[in-house]
Amino acid sequence: MAACEGRRSGALGSSQSDFLTPPVGGAPWAVATTVVMYPPPPPPPHRDFISVTLSFGENYDNSKSWRRRSCWRKWKQLSRLQRNMILFLLAFLLFCGLLFYINLADHWKALAFRLEEEQKMRPEIAGLKPANPPVLPAPQKADTDPENLPEISSQKTQRHIQRGPPHLQIRPPSQDLKDGTQEEATKRQEAPVDPRPEGDPQRTVISWRGAVIEPEQGTELPSRRAEVPTKPPLPPARTQGTPVHLNYRQKGVIDVFLHAWKGYRKFAWGHDELKPVSRSFSEWFGLGLTLIDALDTMWILGLRKEFEEARKWVSKKLHFEKDVDVNLFESTIRILGGLLSAYHLSGDSLFLRKAEDFGNRLMPAFRTPSKIPYSDVNIGTGVAHPPRWTSDSTVAEVTSIQLEFRELSRLTGDKKFQEAVEKVTQHIHGLSGKKDGLVPMFINTHSGLFTHLGVFTLGARADSYYEYLLKQWIQGGKQETQLLEDYVEAIEGVRTHLLRHSEPSKLTFVGELAHGRFSAKMDHLVCFLPGTLALGVYHGLPASHMELAQELMETCYQMNRQMETGLSPEIVHFNLYPQPGRRDVEVKPADRHNLLRPETVESLFYLYRVTGDRKYQDWGWEILQSFSRFTRVPSGGYSSINNVQDPQKPEPRDKMESFFLGETLKYLFLLFSDDPNLLSLDAYVFNTEAHPLPIWTPA
């Protein structure tokens, strides 16, 4: 034990060389008996500076983890999956940034363009100016003798009804006009008019894939636009009278209207739309949408008391100096169309003054690089813009405002309204991307080009484009051949690409086409087509159009009849292949709502006017009874419903759309009338919101 201790102490006390080097001769290690002591180390040299240690916090432990390391070393330490995820994220962010930059550049460009245009042209909204000579001819006054009406075409089908002037009794304009319109009208009526050349001018024949159309006698077709006489007269003043005898079905429509009006007047007066279940209202534009939409309906139904009350609200409460965005399309067809129609039926210049004021406030929407209007415009500030999520407008929106703007130009003498919308029509006419007359659903307001190419439908976002091709041609005295050609070509495109037959009943329907793939989906909105086809036949288009109209009318009726409530859903799908136990029409749960839409009864009206077949009246009566049974709210009003397949629980949606009064009930009233002179199709053309506007006399 002592030896061990001595060895340990010697090893510790000796120098390093003694400890490592064995004795000479290789003798074993010996126990050190002498301890060698080294002198202490010299003191550190004197320093003339002070060393300061900076603390990195209480937890600093002299670790080097805080020091900078090489980014590349750090990158290499990551796994391959981590590196790939980071690279993917960076690429995605770069792509999003690029898209954002492009979109931002477009918006800045459009903003700069709008600012420049606003400096050049500010909307004139100070009120109605004294009318200048109208740019377009006056409305057509149909011959009182049906035998004297000109023949349109040898192909025109025989109708079982009388033709003649409209039977609506229209009162003269007010004498206390503040804007001098009546005085100007007198001057224009006294002004000399150039006589027409003697002799019967040569009739020009338009032929398009089997449609042979002869213009009205005395017209020529040198250009797309209707020729303008120098100083045509204003619409003649007409006197007010009492409506013709009403049958029980028309009285039924009046009862429904009065119940709906009761709810609106009590719970939503002056607001946009009634919420009948909750006995309240909803706002869209804050402009009394339902009231304006229903003005001409009240006049046609003979409800003079209700009309005068609504007219008083328009006079006292309807002002457009509001900081509010309105949709160009919806506000044009409902508000502008409703005011123009009310003016034509009543002769009250109040409605024309309001219409011009509103039309001026919509004009900033057309200040785009492509002249394709933006979808929304602020009627107070004059700032227009596309939807928040895109720079596109829908084709239906930009091509279904022409009837109203053209008529506003004709009445006021201000060309800008007509010129703006006809630039759009002309632009669409020359665009590529169509398919045998069918157009895509979207168009870019900056580039002016179609987007979402290869998708074609006659449903939402495209429907009224086709309707307005025909109706503009009719409105302008059948002189604008380009419109007729585009319409007829589109109908042929429908036959070629969109028409199919269901199983097992072989119902004819119009589907959709997406990049060459057909879908057996049909919106209820497409039920405007039978009526439009029938209207074309009434004005001289081929009889084959009437055959298609009758087939599609049967389909639209079945879309109502095959539902348990007797009301059509918003969208249906047709079976293309025979399968046991399956019907022609099927409805998905998300599509089984009904919004009180007018398209089916609109087409029933046209089909009855053209054919005289009373089954169309019977079908309309069934639909009216279904509305009364499943949508009526006892306290007042009618509500759209969620489920047309459950008569026990149709589930009211608590909303009465303005078009229920403006369109649905108006078309039902006209359908049940046996008087073809009540808004004769020879004298009036209805806009897509059912507001009648006069047909212009050919120049």
From Swiss-Prot:
Optimum pH is between 6.5 and 6.9. Changing E397K: In RAFQS; disrupts stable protein expression. One of its GO terms (molecular function) is calcium ion binding. Ca(2+) binds at T688. InterPro entries: 6hp_glycosidase-like_sf, Glyco_hydro_47, Glycosyl_Hydrolase_47, Seven-hairpin_glycosidases. Pathway: Protein modification; protein glycosylation. It catalyses: N(4)-(alpha-D-Man-(1->2)-alpha-D-Man-(1->2)-alpha-D-Man-(1->3)-[alpha-D-Man-(1->2)-alpha-D-Man-(1->3)-[alpha-D-Man-(1->2)-alpha-D-Man-(1->6)]-alpha-D-Man-(1->6)]-beta-D-Man-(1->4)-beta-D-GlcNAc-(1->4)-beta-D-GlcNAc)-L-asparaginyl-[protein] (N-glucan mannose isomer 9A1,2,3B1,2,3) + 4 H2O = N(4)-(alpha-D-Man-(1->3)-[alpha-D-Man-(1->3)-[alpha-D-Man-(1->6)]-alpha-D-Man-(1->6)]-beta-D-Man-(1->4)-beta-D-GlcNAc-(1->4)-beta-D-GlcNAc)-L-asparaginyl-[protein] (N-glucan mannose isomer 5A1,2) + 4 beta-D-mannose; N(4)-(alpha-D-Man-(1->2)-alpha-D-Man-(1->2)-alpha-D-Man-(1->3)-[alpha-D-Man-(1->3)-[alpha-D-Man-(1->2)-alpha-D-Man-(1->6)]-alpha-D-Man-(1->6)]-beta-D-Man-(1->4)-beta-D-GlcNAc-(1->4)-beta-D-GlcNAc)-L-asparaginyl-[protein] (N-glucan mannose isomer 8A1,2,3B1,3) + 3 H2O = N(4)-(alpha-D-Man-(1->3)-[alpha-D-Man-(1->3)-[alpha-D-Man-(1->6)]-alpha-D-Man-(1->6)]-beta-D-Man-(1->4)-beta-D-GlcNAc-(1->4)-beta-D-GlcNAc)-L-asparaginyl-[protein] (N-glucan mannose isomer 5A1,2) + 3 beta-D-mannose. It is an enzyme of class 3 (hydrolase). Changing H524A: About 4-fold reduction in K(cat). It is a single-pass type II membrane protein. Residues 125-243 are annotated as: Disordered. Widely expressed. Its EC number is 3.2.1.113. Residues 1-84 are cytoplasmic. Gene3D superfamilies: 1.50.10.10. Disulfide bonds join C527-C556. Residues 106-699 are lumenal. One of its GO terms (biological process) is mannoprotein catabolic process. Pfam families: Glyco_hydro_47. Inhibited by both 1-deoxymannojirimycin (dMNJ) and kifunensine. It is linked to Rafiq syndrome: An autosomal recessive disorder characterized by variably impaired intellectual and motor development, a characteristic facial dysmorphism, truncal obesity, and hypotonia. The facial dysmorphism comprises prominent eyebrows with lateral thinning, downward-slanting palpebral fissures, bulbous tip of the nose, large ears, and a thin upper lip. Behavioral problems, including overeating, verbal and physical aggression, have been reported in some cases. Serum transferrin isoelectric focusing shows a type 2 pattern. Belongs to the glycosyl hydrolase 47 family. Involved in glycoprotein quality control targeting of misfolded glycoproteins for degradation. It primarily trims a single alpha-1,2-linked mannose residue from Man(9)GlcNAc(2) to produce Man(8)GlcNAc(2), but at high enzyme concentrations, as found in the ER quality control compartment (ERQC), it further trims the carbohydrates to Man(5-6)GlcNAc(2). This is Endoplasmic reticulum mannosyl-oligosaccharide 1,2-alpha-mannosidase. The gene is MAN1B1.
